[in-house]
Amino acid sequence: MTKIDIPKTPGDFVSLWREQGPVEDSKLELWKEEMAIDSWLMIAEAALFLDAAELFEQINPKLSPAEKATIGLVRRRMLGDTKLEQAIEKAIEIAKNPNTRDLKLEGRLRMERGLSRYENGDIEGAKDDLEWAELRLKSVAKASRDHDLSLLNRAALLMACNAPLMALNVYSEITRDGEHANETIAISRIGASRIRASLGHMFDAARHAWNAHSHAIKAYQTNMAIEAGTLFIELSLGNISPDAERMQIQVDEARPRKVEDSEPTLLVNPKDIDGVFDWCHANLPNSNSGEHRPDLRAMVSIAKNIDKLEFFNKLFLEPDEVEDATLAAMIQVCLDDEEHHRIWGERLSILTLI
């Protein structure tokens, strides 16, 4: 059996500190080195988010002036402060100062300013900052967490500005054979899949969704893997053929096309549909509760289309567990059974009661 090494994260560092801490600084240094965590700033942020105040206070003196300015922004945002413009400008000045300069953090802070400008309606200013930040981070910290975020934020801004083709171009910079995080690749391919589908490029849309599903699994992002997997199936439902090449082979053989090349025809082997469906079903949360359950909605809809409603027999017998009104409405019409229709109609009435 293949052994998968799960990467250590700043969150793991905090967990280890809670198990064995407090410890001396030398021990913290050893943990940081063993976990291959790039900076104390990453650990400080995790300590803030995970409410490890004592660890944060121990790490804080290790931060550079630019890192302290950055963590100050993080803390203010956590406390709900939305008026961060002056604090961001001050942090940028610290990161630019020759005595305290930090090229990577300057890129991150310009990204922060771009997001703040977008929130305040300054679209052009946001575009300038996000593009500048992405170029800087590409040059000094390519494929780092901050560089990945800058690419995803640029693409999101372009989508918000109704420029999907430009967003698609940004997503293409996140290569699958580079050093980008699997989570970043998965997010980018979900976005690219939806754009391609909107353009009618169904083969590319399905290919991107397939890749997103695979990389989300590698990133241990189960919810994202289910989102990508159901997207792949939904895109493929009208194009299933037992004679189709397996999707992974089609993906591996896909090559960039010239303008004059025709769009490949999407044909999907039913074994790939079954494999993705079975994985998604096996990895659904144990609970059916929650007012917003797009995962269950998608899976129930797909199950109806591919004659696999028996996978949800237990769900159909537990109407009181369902809190999503849209899901209840979908389940009500899944079976041609009077009692089933009545029970779920009653549940839907309760959920939609004003």
What are these regions (language model features)?
Residues 6, 33, 62, 103, ...:
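Inter-repeat boundary and helix-capping residues of tandem alpha-helical solenoids
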Residues 57-61, 89-97, 131-142, 169-179, ...:
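Amphipathic alpha-helical segments of tetratricopeptide repeats
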